[in-house]
């Protein structure tokens, strides 16, 4: 048996971190290394389902599962704690309740909302970020509807929901919200015509980078279901009363709203910046083998990493699909570092992208084919189920998966 086995520490049980730890035991034997996984919760949550939990169309418990249920507990030491700092020079991770030494480090700490310095967003807008923020947003929206008819003087701002951002998360949330609002109106005796859902997007288009035909389909569907779009319009300030928005060279508009949702981008975790890695908005431009430049014992993946697409000379978007593929590569490369062997370069295999528009509608491109409506919605559920299967097998898929296809 090897003495002084190398210590592998994996930070974060998101898509990338969990994929690394579940695959690592295939490439590293019990006598080769000690494996520790650190996560602040005892559960993993499906980040790509948070728009559903936030709107209240899917219960938050359906969006998470216990980490101990999917890891090999005889091989992996799970530490539930919060990462406070990474000391690269000392090969040490500082936790809220202690410290961990490492020989090899995997950083998969995920993302935090990017507010671009817009005044009041952090204080007054609701992000779509995790189980806690989703639960809060869902309950807040329900409270506005419940309160509306109890007040002698009716307040339209309670029934006005502003969504900042018409990218992937924003559009998926709007799709769920459009489906949820009629249910809330029925439950709380509110006339649907009194409810306003307003999407504000600074870019000149909805779903940047998506096929224009699919964008038109998504916008038309959402408008039919009561969503108003203000495109080429930036959120300038968020206040307790609502938001100030405006186009360039035009007079700003005040929108009174008790519910402002911010879905316009994320940045890498601040701990990655504070650790001293060269980064862009908290994301480290990693080497082809997913190691941090200048740090041969540190791998970075998921939202914490920036991996360039050589064809477009732009970074790949930080998706769950890529994070999981990175996790497999990191697991293989850790095995090769410990046992000897040439490290593998990460090659993303983009199978497609699908944006949901509620439970039974979606738009996307899969294997080069454009999909919309029911076929796209079917594929979205297949993709969601596949991520469960890859980490937790058939048991987890049957327990948490989505099978209401039509």
From Swiss-Prot:
SUPFAM superfamilies: FAD/NAD(P)-binding domain
InterPro entries, per the entry: FAD/NAD-bd_sf, FAD/NAD-binding_dom, NADH-Q_oxidoreductase
Keywords per UniProt: FAD, Flavoprotein, Oxidoreductase
Names of the cofactor(s): FAD
A single GO BP: aerobic electron transport chain
Keyword field contains Flavoprotein: yes
PANTHER family: 64 KDA MITOCHONDRIAL NADH DEHYDROGENASE (EUROFUNG) (PTHR42913:SF3), APOPTOSIS-INDUCING FACTOR 1 (PTHR42913)
Protein name: NADH dehydrogenase-like protein YumB
